[in-house]
Design a protein with these regions (language model features):
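Bacterial N-terminal signal peptides that target proteins for export
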Residues: 3-22
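C-terminal motif of bacterial Sec signal peptides marking the signal peptidase cleavage site
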Residues: 28-32
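Short coil/loop residues immediately preceding or within conserved phosphate-binding loops
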Residues: 39
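Structural motif
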Residues: 42-51
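Beta-strand-rich cores of mature extracytoplasmic or soluble domains
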Residues: 90-153
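Tryptophan-paired
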Residues: 55-100
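Bacterial signal peptide processing site
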Residues: 34-36
Length: 153
């Protein structure tokens, strides 16, 4: 076998190794994004007179909410930044069975701390307003962020 052919065969793998290293190097910064996220259970509360067939936050679906009910079930999971970012918003969506009363709201997420994660609560309030909270507590707890008439189901 000529020496030139042998050398080519031994170095054939070399470009593949470089491609693999380049791919790994490009993916490395993405691991920082993943580490900066916290995963929360999604929970919904419907304070309105109409059932909500489906609801969700951004691309995460939450299921069905009967009128004047909620908090009884959790959907896994929603990811948000571990560190609060001022002005952070989410898109909350929902619809009834026939889709005629679909809603879509861009809602600002109130300030939260990294130790407050546990639930991402969505409240569909009377009058079409939507509020969200990152909290460890359930509706009815004295320290729950939603107070007064708004907190009534």
């Amino acid at each position: 076998m000529p020496a030139n052919t042998r050398h080519r065969r031994e170095t054939k793998w070399f470009p593949s190794v470089w491609r693999l290293c380049l791919l790994a190097g490009l993916c490395l910064p993405l691991t920082g994004c993943i580490e900066d996220q916290m995963t929360l259970n999604l929970v919904g509360y419907n304070h309105t007179d109409r059932s909500i067939h489906r609801y969700g936050v951004n691309e995460y679906g939450g299921g069905h909410l009967q009128a004047h009910r909620g908090g009884g079930g959790f959907t896994c999971c929603i990811s948000i930044p571990r560190a609060y970012k001022p002005g952070m918003t989410v898109t909350v969506w929902g619809s009834d069975w026939d889709g005629k009363n679909a809603i879509k709201r861009v809602v600002e997420v109130p300030r939260y701390g990294p130790d407050e994660g546990g639930r991402f609560a969505v409240h569909f309030l009377r009058g079409g307003e939507v509020k969200v909270f990152v909290t460890m507590m359930g509706l009815g707890h004295p320290d729950y962020p939603l107070k007064g008439e708004d907190a009534e189901l």
